[in-house]
Amino acid sequence: MTEKKEFGRSGNRDGSEQRNDRNNRSYGERREDRGSSFHNGKRDDRGSSFRGGKRDDRRSNFHDGQRDDRRNYSHDGREDARNNYERDGKFSRGDSDTFKGKTGFKGDAGKPKFDRKQREHAGGEKRPRTAANLDPRQIALETLLDVSVREAYAQLALEKRLKQSRLDARDTAFITRMVYGTIERRITLDYQLDQIIEHDGEIEPVIREILRMGAYQILYMDRVPDMAAVNESVQLTRKMKMGYLAGFVNGILRNLIRKKDELVWPKPEENPARYLSIMFSAPVEFAEMLIDEFGEHEALEILKFRPQKNYESIRPNLLRCDEARLRRLLNDDEFEYESGKVDGTLRVYNAGDMTKLRAYANGLFAIQGESSVLAARAVEAKPGQTILDACAAPGGKTAVISEMMQDTGRVYAWDTHAHRVRLIKGTAERLHIENIRPAMRDAAIERPTMQETLDAAIIDAPCSGSGVIGNKPDLKYRISREAVQSLCKTQQAILNAVSDMVKKGGTLVYSTCSIFKDENEQQIRSFLSTHPDFYVESITSLLPDDLKEHETPYGLQLFAHRDDMDGFYICKMKKMDFVSVK
């Protein structure tokens, strides 16, 4: 088999292959720059940077996103003669939890087409629609309801809906952008709709999401004609068996088209947190937390950041493929790529869904963000050791550690949910790694029988996910002071339990994908104050030159907007070997 064929698309097209990690994934071209002027009234026809797949590099209680991409929307421009009317429906409006405008409409908180050569690898023609398939906008709506009403994670909800739908790449890309664009701008859309709706009361969640979707297309998707957005929204209302509200939806969206240039935006000097909340669609409390910790300017930079170029971060599975071979495979299929900031990683631009490539299915490479790779390498695992990945799913960091150990010794990989343990197993099987021992275990529980049995452990702790909101926009609606306080207690319990399992002279790495000190530096300060047998060890030798200056005596804090990597915290600690102390 030639290398080119090995890198081609695999025959598995049902999406059953789970992505092994979760970092810098971005589909579509970048969004509009929302610079310091904060002008947010411009349409956004340049895609977005949400990235998908199940990935390990952004572990959080709030994870799971999927990527999105641009699509040629010209076929959506058809007019429906049945909808050639306009009236303002009388309907009650929904309670929500973010803003109260004069009308009370308060916010509650794909994959791109492969290029020609990649489509050839896929084989076969476009899969025909079946009776089981829904209209793309209906799938997007159901996914949004999964997230806003059923409190599902966007990534998981979207993956499930797309797998059931069996749509082609074009519709998949459209659905993904619609879902993530609407989630990303939820509060902003509600604020805009708030200025149009003139009715009090409660709005059904279905209608609220249809209005958000319609407003997103009208205000931020230039390739969808305004009237097509209206007509499709009206039809969607009918498909959801709520035709009696079709006139209401029609009237609101038509009024939005007429008045979109007259929308009023808040002024930053009046209420900075509310301003950031509306302009960048973040809950007020989250905006306040950012301002309190980083100041207004830095909070703005954190909320507005989007990658300049969208890419997929990958690394070779060193047990089966070196970097030189991976580069040859990419060259053969004419991928655009460059070296990542972290040694041994590559950034592949306009990558498409790389989980469909045969080389991925054969375990030649892993999709994993550079911050995640860096955290795993901080363990500095050696062959023959016994190591614990305490919060391992779906196994990206576990795999890096196993590769450093040359598939010898033993790596315990724990997670608290059976389905996440299955992801770890899937990652190990795909990468052909044999020294991983997945198990459903709660790392916060003390285990006297394992005391001082580990050469090293890594805790990629459950966290707020505040460092990766650009890729997983649904996470920001879950962030609050109360949530962070609860997470800190969990993190502390895991640190206490796992540290007892580390041998004297052993290594303990703590990481999160958060940017809040309470979850990071303060957590380590507190831990060290009660565990004097541990001390922080520098990881400067592992860092790219431009990151070395950011390491502190209490670890390394990465920021997406500053460092061009996922927001991450990494702290390496060593347990003192008292025997060697004189």
Language-model segment annotations:
Residues 1-582:
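S-adenosylmethionine
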